[in-house]
């Protein structure tokens, strides 16, 4: 109630003045009358702050009842009472106000009563804090003062009080009845919880914080949110038969309670046929401090019993301060809830105001609950209203309308029923936002679906300058809608309590324009040069004023605005404008137009538009225009028609039969195999001519297009192409389209491509106009893995104790697909397990193991794990188990245990290092042990290794190394071998390589001990495994392995001496010479046949004639 605490700084006023108005509807944009707080009256106490004149309003036919809850009294009997509050009756004709006195008594010190507190204190009682009544002078008027209190020797009892009169026909109240049922002493404070808790029952009731008069004038519903420790309740005050009057049955209290309802001014008027019912909130489990009864109303909510009046009241602090509202009926001392509405924001004060009205014309009452402290994002106190549309059987459809302004306007502080202000069959409402600058009121129209989403009109405070009391709070007081000027349309008033003013807004009649434009035919023949256009128009309105029923219209007709193929004969342009007087009767005008035919535009219709509006506008002034009318801004303001060209088809619109099919589309695509994916489509028309045939295509992945043909365009990942170079596609014609998608970034499991063809006409068989291709996407990558030892081969004759082996590996992707995550694992054997023992034989000095990997010029992180899958080194760029200076490093496992790996002696499988004496003992005992036993132990290793030799070596080495003399040391038998695993993860792209450098030291003493006769070669085999994420079976890639193992030989591999080669060559030459000589001696080279032929020729010389003949032939 403290307005000062809610005022905004004046700095916002200049900004608010710049806010553009929503297009005005039928209320005047400025008030027709301003009614100010009366200054001519004599007040006994000076007014030091705003009287809040206009806080509550009840409009009647010729006057308006105005509440000013902080006004000083003009009565002599109340001359010493501060801010009694006042009710004024103000003339709607001249704006003159006079006090409307409901209670002329001052403060009362009543004699002691056994039953009730009868003394009265009216200081700051807020008379007019709530007020309600119908819009006729014959309707009842209910006025309340919620801060009225009764003093006692110990407390002040904030009971509240209300007054009502049967009508306001007379200029002064007649037969005022007071309602004050909370004065019984026995009901002030009650014990609860078996006497362990005291409850403020009636003592702080605040009767009259809200008040409502039912439309039939037979019932009052009054809120008392302070009852029962602010659980709150309502007082239903209604007509009852005398025998049903509960006050008549109360022993010894009937006279005291009857004073509750008696006429203030006369003891002769006792309406005993009215009685209050006060439900006890504890009986239905109302929460403490929930303020039930803060706002009240009534309506016909039950679709199964549409004549039963039910009630609605709010509890803004219920539901953990999110607020609730209930539809209920009063049943004795309790209520029966039919439905519960709830707010959605903590502290939004859901239920500050409530309104019950049928908004969609279905005969069922709907509910609006305001939440003026609803917060928009990054703000507060913006406000909202919750609209609950009654769908029947207490099912409600919720709609939330948030403040149209972003300031802290407290939109929804006041709600009012305006009735059907535009006569469209639906009731409308006003919503106050009194703290939007100086205040704003929004008008919302009802519709078939409830309230429209946007306000039809916004009424700002007439003055943007603050009053002497601050911002005006324009819109905190709203009257109902009432036709005060007799034009058939409801007017209403708005109160601005902090400006101490009431503003009257009259409503203009609403008219509807019915206008059409059409051509004499829907088709234009190619040879046709002229077309006749007809424009028709008329008005309709519910107004009975003859001056309103006829309005001047401004009409503008435009044709073919884009191509301008048509022009009016009269203007020689494609537009014509004129004015006409329209009324209830339809009138028409004809216009002749000239048409220019164009073959290429035959498929483009000629658009025909007629724009119309009232010429006489509502003036932006305080003067009401008696002959003006207004059109609903949501009504159409243009009439349209299209005219087509004749196409030679059987009907006005051609029926084509387009067929679409894709050609040679592969069902699968290997990701990365190409940057573009091409699809070919063929389109055939087997129906009538297809005008403006078009083809569009898109993909579910919204792929970009690699190429856009000249006859195509791309809009939002959809390519649209004009077929047949933009010309019509005749029957039997075929066209084709090639589409190229950019698939360089494509991923996923499948690609779905949708294609469609269409034309401007009808389609005989739409099912074959669409083509959907589902292409399965697969990944495949070919990987080359190669590598081996880069330093010289080790033999035990030239190396002793230990030797370092350096390996380089390269893993390269040959594509085509990218592997999103490839895990590369190297398995490196480091020690043998001794059968039947817990000891192990270390082969590779794990502390010397160093690895460095790079990919695409970037170092890769390497994770190192032991045989128990315990991570030893986490994400280093270089794996090493030695520190600078050659010191041994303690390896920390994930379970925070630590151990050192030593290069000499035997280490237990538990990775616990033996102490020095144990290592020495083990070394000495090994030298003294039985050779037979030692051989047997090595034979056991050799036998296991020999079994796997052929399987574990590559094909190149299977032929080079003797099977029966080679031992293979690898990680494929976890029962015999201890290994470590180096793991890397990489986003593997084609033509990119992983390069790994690995080096470690080998304990040659152990190797030498193992290589007993007949074993000659010790092979260290490092395994490589690749794992692709999402492919546990590794079907989407292949590996070409060329990885060479590390070979340690027992003896040096010697080459063939050069002198042996020279001797062999000489010996070969001598042997060849000897063989050739022997063959010559034995006549192998003699040619006997040739010698015989030569001898025969000599014995038979050629005849001369033949010789001469031969010579003559040559001449």
From Swiss-Prot:
Q: Which domain of life is it from?
A: Eukaryota
Q: Which residues are glycosylated?
A: 46, 82, 166, 438, 696, 845, 868, 964
> Among its keywords, does the record have Glycoprotein?
yes
Q: Which residue intervals correspond to the FG-GAP repeats?
A: 39-99, 113-174, 193-246, 278-335, 336-397, 398-453, 460-522
The places in or outside the cell where this protein is found are:
Apical cell membrane; Lateral cell membrane; Cytoplasm
> Which BP terms does GO give this entry?
apoptotic cell clearance; axon guidance; behavioral response to ethanol; cell adhesion mediated by integrin; cell migration; cell-cell adhesion; cell-matrix adhesion; dorsal closure
* One Gene Ontology term, aspect cellular component: cytoplasm
Pfam families xref list: FG-GAP, Integrin_A_Ig_1, Integrin_A_Ig_2
Q: What is its main location?
A: membrane
Q: Which SUPFAM superfamilies does the UniProt record give? A: Integrin alpha N-terminal domain (SSF69318), Integrin domains (SSF69179)
Keyword Transmembrane part of the UniProt annotation = yes
What is known about what this protein does?
Answer: Integrin alpha-PS3/beta-PS is a receptor for laminin. Also binds to wb. Important during embryogenesis for the development of the trachea, dorsal vessel and salivary gland, as well as for dorsal closure. Required for short-term memory processes. Minor involvement in the establishment of the oocyte anterior-posterior length. Plays a role in timely border cell migration during oogenesis, probably mediated by JNK signaling.
Q: Please describe the quaternary structure of this protein.
A: Heterodimer of an alpha and a beta subunit. The alpha subunit is composed of a heavy and a light chain linked by a disulfide bond. Interacts with mys/beta-PS and Itgbn.
Name the UniProt record assigns to this protein? Integrin alpha-PS3
- Say which species the protein is native to: Drosophila melanogaster
């Amino acid at each position: 109630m403290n307005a000062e605490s809610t005022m905004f700084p004046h700095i916002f006023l200049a900004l608010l003045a710049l806010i553009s108005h929503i297009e005005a509807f039928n209320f005047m944009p400025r008030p027709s009358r301003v009614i100010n707080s009366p200054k001519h009256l004599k007040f006994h106490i000076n007014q030091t702050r705003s009287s809040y004149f206009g806080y509550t309003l009840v409009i009647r036919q010729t006057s308006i009842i105005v509440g000013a809850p902080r006004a000083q009294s003009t009565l002599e009997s109340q001359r010493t009472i501060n801010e009694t509050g006042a009710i004024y009756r103000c003339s709607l004709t001249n704006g003159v106000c006079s006090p409307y006195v409901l209670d002329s008594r001052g403060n009362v010190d009543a004699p002691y009563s056994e039953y009730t507190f009868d003394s009265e204190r009216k200081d700051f009682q807020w008379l007019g804090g709530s007020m309600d009544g119908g819009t006729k002078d014959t309707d009842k008027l209910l006025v309340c003062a919620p801060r009225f209190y009764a003093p006692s020797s110990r407390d002040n009892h904030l009971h509240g009080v209300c007054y009502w009169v049967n009508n306001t026909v007379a200029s002064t109240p007649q037969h005022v009845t007071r309602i004050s049922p909370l004065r019984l002493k026995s009901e002030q404070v009650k014990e609860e919880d078996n006497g362990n808790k005291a409850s403020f029952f009636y003592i702080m009731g605040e009767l009259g914080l809200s008040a409502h008069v039912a439309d039939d004038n037979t019932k009052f519903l009054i809120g008392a949110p302070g009852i029962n420790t602010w659980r709150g309740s309502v007082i239903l005050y209604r007509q009852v038969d005398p025998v049903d009057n509960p006050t008549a049955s109360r022993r010894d209290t009937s006279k005291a309670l009857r004073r509750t309802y008696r006429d203030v001014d006369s003891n002769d008027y006792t309406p005993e046929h009215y009685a209050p019912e006060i439900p006890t909130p504890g009986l239905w489990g109302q929460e403490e401090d929930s303020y039930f009864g803060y706002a009240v109303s009534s309506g016909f909510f039950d679709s199964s019993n549409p004549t039963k009046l039910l009630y609605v009241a709010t509890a803004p602090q219920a539901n953990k301060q999110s607020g609730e509202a209930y539809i209920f009926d009063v049943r004795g001392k309790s209520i029966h809830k039919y439905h519960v509405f709830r707010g959605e924001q903590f502290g939004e004060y859901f239920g500050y105001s409530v309104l019950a009205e049928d908004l969609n014309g279905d005969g069922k009452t709907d509910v609006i609950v305001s939440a003026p402290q609803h917060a928009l994002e990054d703000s507060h106190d913006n406000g909202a209203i919750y609209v609950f549309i009654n769908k029947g059987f207490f099912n409600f459809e919720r709609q939330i309308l948030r403040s149209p302004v972003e300031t802290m306007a407290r939109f929804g502080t006041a709600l009012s029923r305006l009735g059907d202000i535009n006569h469209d069959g639906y009731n409308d409402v006003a919503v106050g936002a009194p703290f939007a600058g100086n205040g704003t009121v929004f008008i919302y129209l009802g519709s078939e679906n409830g309230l429209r989403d946007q306000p039809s009109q916004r009424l700002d405070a007439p003055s943007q300058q603050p009053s002497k009391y601050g911002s005006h709070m324009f819109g905190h007081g709203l009257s109902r809608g009432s036709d005060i000027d007799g034009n058939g349309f409801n007017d209403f008033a708005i109160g601005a309590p902090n400006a101490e003013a009431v503003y009257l807004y009259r409503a203009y009649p609403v008219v509807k324009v019915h206008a059409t434009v059409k051509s004499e035919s829907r088709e234009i023949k190619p040879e046709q040069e002229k077309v006749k256009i007809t424009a028709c128009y008329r008005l309709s309105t519910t107004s009975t004023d003859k001056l309103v029923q006829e309005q001047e219209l401004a009409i503008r007709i435009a044709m073919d605005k884009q191509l301008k193929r048509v022009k009016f004969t009269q203007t020689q342009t494609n537009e014509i404008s004129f004015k006409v007087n329209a009324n209830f009767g339809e009138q028409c005008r004809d216009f002749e137009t000239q048409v220019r035919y164009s073959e290429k535009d035959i498929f483009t219709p000629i658009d025909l538009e007629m724009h119309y509006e009232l010429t006489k506008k509502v003036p932006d002034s305080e003067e009401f225009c008696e002959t003006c009318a207004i059109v609903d801004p949501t009504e159409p303001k243009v009439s349209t028609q299209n005219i087509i060209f004749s196409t030679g088809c059987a009907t006005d619109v051609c029926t084509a039969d387009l067929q679409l099919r894709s050609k040679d589309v592969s069902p699968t695509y290997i990701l990365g195999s190409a940057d573009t994916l091409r699809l070919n489509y063929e389109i055939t028309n087997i129906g009538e001519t297809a005008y403006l045939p078009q083809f569009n295509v898109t993909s579910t992945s919204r792929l970009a297009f690699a190429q856009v043909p000249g006859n195509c365009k791309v809009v939002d990942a959809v390519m649209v192409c004009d077929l047949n170079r933009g010309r019509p596609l005749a029957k039997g014609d075929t066209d084709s389209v090639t589409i190229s998608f950019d698939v360089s970034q494509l991923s996923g499991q499948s690609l779905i491509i949708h294609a469609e063809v269409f034309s401007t006409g009808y389609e005989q068989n739409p099912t074959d106009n669409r083509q959907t291709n589902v292409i399965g996407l697969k990944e495949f990558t070919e990987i080359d893995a190669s590598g081996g030892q880069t330093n010289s081969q080790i033999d035990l004759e030239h190396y002793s104790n230990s030797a370092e082996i350096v390996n380089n590996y390269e893993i390269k992707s040959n594509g085509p697909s990218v592997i999103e995550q490839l895990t590369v694992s190297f398995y490196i054997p480091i020690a043998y397990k001794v059968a039947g023992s817990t000891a192990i034989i270390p082969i590779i000095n794990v502390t010397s193991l160093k690895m460095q990997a790079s990919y695409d010029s970037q170092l890769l992180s390497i994770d190192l794990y032991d045989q128990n899958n315990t991570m030893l080194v986490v994400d280093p760029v270089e794996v090493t188990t030695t520190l600078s200076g050659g010191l041994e490093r303690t390896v920390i496992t994930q379970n925070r245990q630590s151990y050192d790996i030593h290069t000499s002696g035997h280490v237990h499988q538990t990775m616990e290092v033996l102490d020095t004496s144990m290592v020495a003992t083990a070394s000495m005992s090994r030298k003294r042990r039985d050779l037979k036993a030692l051989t047997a132990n090595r034979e056991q290793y050799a036998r296991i290794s020999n079994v796997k030799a052929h399987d574990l070596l590559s094909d190149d080495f299977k032929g080079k190394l003797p099977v029966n003399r080679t031992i293979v040391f690898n990680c494929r038998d976890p029962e015999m071998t201890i290994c470590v695993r180096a793991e890397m993860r990489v986003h593997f792209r084609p033509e990119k390589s992983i390069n790994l450098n690995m080096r470690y030291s080998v304990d040659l003493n152990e190797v030498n001990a193992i290589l007993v006769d007949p074993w000659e070669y010790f092979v260290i085999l490092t395994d490589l495994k690749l794992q692709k994420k999402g492919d546990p079976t590794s079907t989407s890639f292949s590996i070409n392995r060329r990885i060479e193992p590390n070979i340690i030989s027992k003896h040096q591999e010697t080459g063939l001496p050069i002198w042996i080669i020279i001797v062999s060559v000489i010996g070969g030459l001598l042997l060849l010479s000897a063989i050739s000589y022997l063959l010559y001696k034995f006549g192998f080279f003699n040619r006997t046949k040739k010698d015989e032929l030569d001898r025969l020729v000599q014995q038979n010389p050629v005849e001369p004639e033949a010789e001469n003949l031969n010579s003559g032939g040559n001449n």
